[in-house]
């Protein structure tokens, strides 16, 4: 069964996608449901903010990307930026540009991936927006996090002889992208095809280090 987004309207869709969301972080004072989220961070913390915009046809291809995987990946790429600066992600806002090609059920699937990522990394969804799009799907996520003021890691802080550490399999996600673009099929993130799974559902392993 397909439900057109127009049958719910913008606010009805937002209510459906965010139903049952609970705030887990102490810095999240008020989330979805008002004109703005309310956040409160301790004075000894530095607040970190990052935004990523993903555009259909540029950053992902709906031919082979399941919506749940896309939602998950859209969230964790933002978490990654916060972790990279030695911070902890706390909240996100999610904004979507949707063409008429997408149904309410499609957005349920996309949001299930976003919510799964937030549950795994203890991040609160505190707001967002939806609008119509003439060119497909656009996903913009802003992530807010915190770090101890004297422990923020900047790119320009790298020095000669510093040890560079990486996690995961370098190049695996790119190899997965090449395979998916060649085959042009949805592999459903099959773990029997490791590189395609790595590309479809990126994991932010820094949180586990």
Roles of regions detected by a PLM:
Residues 191-201:
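Polyanion-binding loop/helix "lid" in catalytic or ligand-binding cores
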Residues 67-91, 112-120:
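Small-aliphatic-rich amphipathic alpha-helix that forms the alpha element of a beta-alpha
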Residues 33, 65-69, 73, 105, ...:
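Residues at secondary-structure transition points
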Residues 54, 89-185:
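Glycine-rich anion-binding loops of enzyme active sites
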Residues 199-202, 206-209:
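Single conserved hydrophobic/aromatic residue that forms the stacking wall/gate
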Residues 38, 78, 86, 125, ...:
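Residue-level signal for inorganic ion chemistry
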Residues 1-66, 94:
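Extreme N-terminal cap/leader segments of soluble proteins
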């Amino acid at each position: 069964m397909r439900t057109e987004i127009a049958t719910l309207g913008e606010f009805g869709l937002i209510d459906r996608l965010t139903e049952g969301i609970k705030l887990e972080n102490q810095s999240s004072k008020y989330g979805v449901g008002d004109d703005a989220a309310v956040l409160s961070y301790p004075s000894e913390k530095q607040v970190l903010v990052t935004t990523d915009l993903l555009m259909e046809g540029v950053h992902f291809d709906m031919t082979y990307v399941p919506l749940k995987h896309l939602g998950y990946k859209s969230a964790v790429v933002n978490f990654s930026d916060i972790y990279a600066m030695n911070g902890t992600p706390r909240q996100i806002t999610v904004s979507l540009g949707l063409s008429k090609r997408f149904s309410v059920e499609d957005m349920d699937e996309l949001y299930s991936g976003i919510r799964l990522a937030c549950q795994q990394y203890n991040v609160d969804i505190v707001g967002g927006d939806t609008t119509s799009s003439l060119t497909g799907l656009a996903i913009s996520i802003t992530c807010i996090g915190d770090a101890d003021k004297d422990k923020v890691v900047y790119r320009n802080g790298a020095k000669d002889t510093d040890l560079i550490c990486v996690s995961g399999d370098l190049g695996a996600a790119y190899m997965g992208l090449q395979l998916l673009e060649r085959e042009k099929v949805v592999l459903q993130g099959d773990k029997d095809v490791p590189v395609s799974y790595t590309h479809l559902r990126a994991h932010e392993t820094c949180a586990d280090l």
